[in-house]
Amino acid sequence: MRLPLPLLLLFGCRAILGSAGDRVSLSASAPTLDDEEKYSAHMPAHLRCDACRAVAFQMGQRLAKAEAKSHTPDASGLQELSESTYTDVLDQTCSQNWQSYGVHEVNQMKRLTGPGLSKGPEPRISVMISGGPWPNRLSKTCFHYLGEFGEDQIYEAYRQGQANLEALLCGGTHGPCSQEILAQREEL
């Protein structure tokens, strides 16, 4: 008997899938969250790199969408947004509901998951915990970057490419995705 994925998760995340000759057993369980992950108003330190990458992705997506609608090309023929427009777009990015993001566990390590975050091999099946404190934490993280760098600097980095935007927000020697910070995260 084959069950759709939501039913598999509902019935303990165990099922036998595949064709008649090649049966594969898959199982998944929800990540076990510690008190900080459950109750803190702030993004836990070990998830800040993922959160930063999610924010950079959403900013880039929304700015690109706004530029596609714009009718004001710059000297190179690309669409350039007015300051008031990109300020509004970035503010709306941070104010969105962030419901498509959550936390799951990969190789005994908790990671944020959602649009713009898949890097490396993903598990064949996993359980994501979304809602709860995660949308508010991502919104706060987004507004933190707006305050730290400002809309002008963020838009300028975006105009140089998505990689530059992510480097501005997440890189640097003390950024959440710096090698030093990631090494400390792995030690935990």
Swiss-Prot record:
Name listed for the protein in its UniProt record: Marginal zone B- and B1-cell-specific protein
Q: Which residues form each disulfide bond in the chain?
A: 49-177, 52-170, 94-142
Instruction: Tell whether Amino-acid biosynthesis is among the UniProt keywords.
Output: no
Q: Which organism is it from?
A: Mus musculus (Mouse)
Member of which family? Belongs to the MZB1 family.
**Record's keyword terms, sorted:** Disulfide bond, Endoplasmic reticulum, Secreted, Signal
Q: Which Pfam families match?
A: DUF3456
What happens upon changing residue 49 to A? Answer: Reduced electrophoretic mobility
